[in-house]
Amino acid sequence: MTKKRGDGELVQVGELPMMKQLAKKLAPPTKAQQEFINAAVVIRTDPDAVERAFMARQLVLCTLPHSDPGDANPRWLRRTGNSSLIIQPGWDGQEDKSFGYPFGSIPRLLLFWITTEVQRTKNRENMTDLEKRTLQLGRSLNDFMRAVGLNPYTGGGKRGDGKRLHGQMDRLFNSRITFQQTAEDVNIKGRHSLNMEVAPESELWWDVRQPAQGSLWNSWIRLGEDFYKALVLLPVPVDMRALRALKRSPLALDLYAWICYRSFVIVQKQQPPQFTAWEVLMRQLGTDYTDPDNFKKKASKALAKVKTIYPGLSIGKAKGGFTVHATRLAVPQKTVTTISS
């Protein structure tokens, strides 16, 4: 069937903008979209069957870069309110160059895994402090990829999860992280700084080209003492099932952890819906963005995904921002410890 153009030419009905838009809406979901839908169904069908994971509160309130900052600057800074996160990259002695900054979804998934392992072993009386700070990564890269929520079957090429994971591990484990907080009163001004090596000692024996093949030796990392202490205190509980569903978007991962933190306080204190301004959220989680309208657009899409995989969460529209309300925790109360607001 055809329709006349204004100049008398004919055009296929399927080429009309309205029909293209309708066809797009009716198109079958992509593989990634179907995986997200399946994950959401599982979580909503049994919301209490959580796979407990944690993130350090400081890394929820100030987050890593979304994209690669490059090597032009000797440090990367994110500031929100009176809190700051500063990252300095490590140096590769073999290549005589910077490892670069950790960025994107993968170092976030690594930090979720690290914080969760720290919480799992922190109270074991049969382990020394050094043993608690030493995390075993295993002999197989494939097994570790599954543990952090990645797909071991994406191949060993440049864009495969294995290659990207190995590169981001180098970036994260060799970096130095600083948390800073300032306090100011009428007569006094103070600042607290905590400078930390992430993993001052590590051994990685995996072959990215053969990720399924086990090595003769275990791979492991030893967390810096101060970094370990920071991870132990006041972690934010999250559901690993949701992390796997959101892993393609660093912004969605950041927003999910932030929503879990906000919702914990809302549910515990039975608060009404809490307002957040887009401008404030952009300063906190979106410093990679330069256009506020673009950030709002991307954050709105990410929040819609978070709402889909968080039963009991409500996101409302408000002038200049949005409201957050929750009727339940992302992780059931009986499985979490109290976090400070």
Locations of the language-model features?
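Charged, alpha-helix-forming regions
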Residues: 1-341
